[in-house]
Swiss-Prot record:
Transmembrane segments: none
Descriptive protein name: Type III pantothenate kinase
Keywords: ATP-binding, Coenzyme A biosynthesis, Cytoplasm, Kinase, Metal-binding, Nucleotide-binding, Potassium, Transferase
Cofactor note: A monovalent cation. Ammonium or potassium.
Catalytic activity field: (R)-pantothenate + ATP = (R)-4'-phosphopantothenate + ADP + H(+)
Binding site for K(+): D129
Superkingdom as given in the UniProt entry: Bacteria
Active site (catalytic residues): D109
GO molecular function, one term: pantothenate kinase activity
Positions contributing to ATP binding: D6, V7, G8, N9, T10, N11, I12, V13, T132
EC number per UniProt: 2.7.1.33
Keyword Metal-binding carried by entry: yes
Organism: Exiguobacterium sibiricum (strain DSM 17290 / CCUG 55495 / CIP 109462 / JCM 13490 / 255-15)
Quaternary structure note: Homodimer.
Length: 253
């Protein structure tokens, strides 16, 4: 079995694979102040609750967009799993041809998603990942990665509105029953939800105008909710990043 760890700005997602089967997955908060032992005790508790043994883990792969968290997690893997993790970074085997100005600038999460998508689906592909930032990536049928778009994430936008507008409340992200809101919360939910649906469809349309038709895959925490009204999202794959980590680990063994 292998343990995959995806560190995002808001959450850390962990998964355990037995060959190609995802046995269990968890989502915990990204905390830059946690120590090696705090992460270790937390992950051991998750394993214990799922009736999994840390001794059965034969390999670990780690991807992070939060550099300060890498060191304690690497140490956690060594101390609690007796395994040094394979860390996603420049120079690894991905099978992608990066057609961007500076390949080292491309986030590990975007590379991992692209690897998984090119294995699981026929290209050309557009990947929309709803995280702290919402990212869009274009990959052609020959697995050439042409870059994409980065925009503020849904939660970042709503928190900014709450923090900067004195009389506006913090809201739950939800799909409202109508576009026109009859109260403040409803109006904010409409602007957030339908605004992001429009953003996705508008940006995907522009990407297709530049690059040609492509299958649109959505992943990330709000992918399924946004896809309910999106005219362009065709596939929702909640485990795209975890699958990508597994695939990259296998290619680099």
């Amino acid at each position: 079995m292998i343990l995959v760890i995806d560190v995002g700005n808001t959450n850390i997602v962990l998964g355990v694979y037995d060959e190609q089967t995802l046995l269990q997955h968890w989502r915990i908060a990204t905390d830059r102040t946690r120590t090696t032992d705090e992460y270790g005790m937390l992950v051991k508790a998750l394993f214990r609750d799922a009736e999994l043994n840390v001794e059965d883990i034969e390999g670990i792969v780690l991807s992070s967009v939060v550099p300060p968290v890498v060191f304690p997690l690497e140490n956690m893997c060594v101390r609690y799993f007796n395994r040094r993790p394979f860390v996603i970074g420049p120079g690894i085997k991905t099978g992608l041809d990066l057609k961007v100005d500076n390949p080292r600038e491309v986030g590990a999460d975007r590379i991992v998603n692209a690897v998984a998508a090119t294995v699981k689906y026929d290209g050309p592909l557009i990947i929309v990942d709803f995280g702290t930032a919402t990212t869009y990536c274009y990959i052609d049928a020959q697995k050439r990665y042409y870059g994409g778009i980065i925009s503020p994430g849904v939660m970042v936008s709503t928190e900014a509105l709450y923090n900067k507008a004195a009389k506006l409340p913090r809201i739950e992200i939800a799909k409202p029953q109508s576009t026109i809101g009859r109260n403040t919360v409803h109006a904010m939910q409409s602007g957030t939800y339908f605004g992001y649906v429009a953003q996705v469809d508008g940006l995907v349309h522009r990407m297709k105008e530049e690059m040609g038709e492509a299958t649109v895959i959505a992943t990330g925490g709000l992918a399924r909710l946004i896809s309910e009204e999106s005219a362009t999202i065709k596939i929702v794959d909640p485990f795209l990043t975890l699958d990508g980590l597994r695939i990259i680990y296998e290619r680099n063994k």
